[in-house]
């Protein structure tokens, strides 16, 4: 009985701790407007929102490391990476040239006014948010070499 009660409290606490994605509209690099809540809402699909900037070396290393596994992960885990650039109006012009050189397969969104960053209370980058069925199920701040393995294990557990 005690174990059952503890399990219910734990599961209830986890469910309560999940935050919904905010309804924020951003532009893609092709100038198309998308809403992060409604346009990334396929049932049971996992969305990895990776917040980054052109001036952030760890951010670029993280996106490069994920890219090495992306084709396999996206098939195996039914997941998609959405790279959200927080470059402001001064540095946003560097995003497209960097993307042209990297050839990342990700959807890239521009948060130049940092509306999504603020709505999610993100202090600094790199910052990764995992969303499933509209709820934020995991967050991670920072990147160290090999961090993609931790990300993969987290994705597998979902």
What spans do the regions from the language model cover?
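Sec-dependent N-terminal signal peptides
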Residues: 4-13
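Boundary of Sec targeting at the N-terminus
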Residues: 16-19
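A short beta-strand-turn-helix
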Residues: 25-46
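Short pre-active-site segment immediately N-terminal to redox-active cysteine/selenocysteine motifs
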Residues: 44-47, 51-55, 124
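Hydrophobic beta-strand anchors of alpha/beta hydrolase catalytic cores
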Residues: 48-49, 81, 128
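Structural microenvironment flanking redox-active thiols in thiol-disulfide oxidoreductases
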Residues: 61-101, 115-116
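Short, internal strand/loop/helix patches
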Residues: 96-131
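Thiol-/selenol-based redox modules, centered on thioredoxin-like
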Residues: 129-158
